[in-house]
Amino acid sequence: MASLGEIGGLPMQVSPLLSRRRLLGVAAAVTTVGLVTPAPAISYAPRSISLYNPHTGEWLRTVYWADGHYIREAVRDINWILRDHHTDEMRPMDAGVLDVLGMLREQLDTPEPFLVVSGYRSPATNMNMYLHGEGVAKHSYHIKGMAVDLRSERRSLEQVREAAMSLQCGGVGYYPRASFVHVDCGPIRHW
């Protein structure tokens, strides 16, 4: 991923997910029109996220991207609500997973917040969970700030899973017994 520099003292990355979508959109326009569409055809519609962290009681509804740029304060707030709630450690979340969450919200067509089961996990928290057989990967995308486990109050887990899989933007894990869906911005796969 290409670096966007620092947002609020936190490094940001350009999400290849929407870039890939933009490329497909431009390719479709070229096929339909027969001409290369100028740059203004690329959508700069605002992207928003709504999150509730039941572990901390915090909630957030914010536009995190507008006018072609990530919004520093919004990204900082998202990073905080997605922090490791066991240790209060925060790290910059990958822009790709923010965009997955934003697209998932749009796909589900709901303004309600996602309930955050797990966002960033410190290496110590992840290792503790791994050693206690909690079903986490030893080298989890959560450690890299590239994954979020979530659920929705108004949408079934199946609806969330199907919507996430339809995006074709990363990993989607379905955990009905634990009542959450895992989304990440790694390779496209599902389980």
Where are each of the predicted segments found?
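Charged, often glycine-rich, active-site loop that binds/positions anionic groups
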Residues: 123-138
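N-terminal secretory signal peptides and thylakoid transit peptides that target proteins
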Residues: 7-34
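Active-site acidic/histidine clusters and adjacent loop/turn architecture
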Residues: 67-117
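Sec/Tat signal peptide C-region and signal peptidase I cleavage site
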Residues: 37-41
